Amino acid sequence: MEKSKISFSERIHFIGIGGIGMSSIAQYLYEKENTILGYDASENKSVKILEKKGIEVTNKLSLKSIPYYMKNDDVIVVYTPAIPDDNIFLKYFRANGNKKIQKRSEILGEISKQSKCIAIAGTHGKTTTTAIIRHLFHSSGIHFKAFIGGIMKCFDSNYINTGNDFILVEADEYDRSFLNLNPNYAVITSIESDHLDIYGDLKSLVESFQSFTNNVKDVLITDAEIDIDTDFSFSIKSDSDYYV
């Protein structure tokens, strides 16, 4: 299947647009003057933010909700691993011959190439750490785009755009999504047993994090207890590079 390099004036259909990771990407692509339509069963905070910005969202699980201009085979379709293969929209676009049907992580991987990328990974602590870096950047006048796994109250959004110097993203290990990223810098906050429906055991999860570190171009920072080669470590103990 063809991978898309999205620029301007594309037509993009999001299946599950209200997801915290999907909605931030939708906002980014909408800023680039693409035509965005999304489906989500929920009317959550993310959906309300999208609608407030002018992005059309439907909660009707019906092919009748797809307008004519979204039915051509050149429409880009974005979905998440949470969307089952028998989803009626996904089945429709596959049967329709759409060549650009991609997971959210693949689109985020393309976005991460646009500027110097800082990726925050870890079983726990990703959103908190990303939010702290966002605060430091914003307070320091550093220009950045941030794709955050939570709604920042001070911005009322999970997508923040102040410029192009850096791209700040959460690196999600679910479904090995973070292997699509292209980080210059990365932080791993923790590695603990999680998503074993995907990985089977902790060993496979650790191996996936190791593969993620192999994609880091410049600097890797990890919790000192993580058994992965790193440039800098952090801890509450004094035997790490940085400690409190």
PLM regions and their residue ranges:
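N-terminal Rossmann NAD(P)H-binding glycine-rich loop of SDR-like oxidoreductase domains
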Residues: G18, A26
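Conserved N-terminal Rossmann-fold NAD(P)-binding element of oxidoreductases
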Residues: H13-I17
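N-terminal Rossmann-fold NAD(P) dinucleotide-binding loop
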Residues: M22
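Short acidic-hydrophobic, aromatic-tinged amphipathic segments that line or gate anion-handling sites
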Residues: E56-L61, Q102
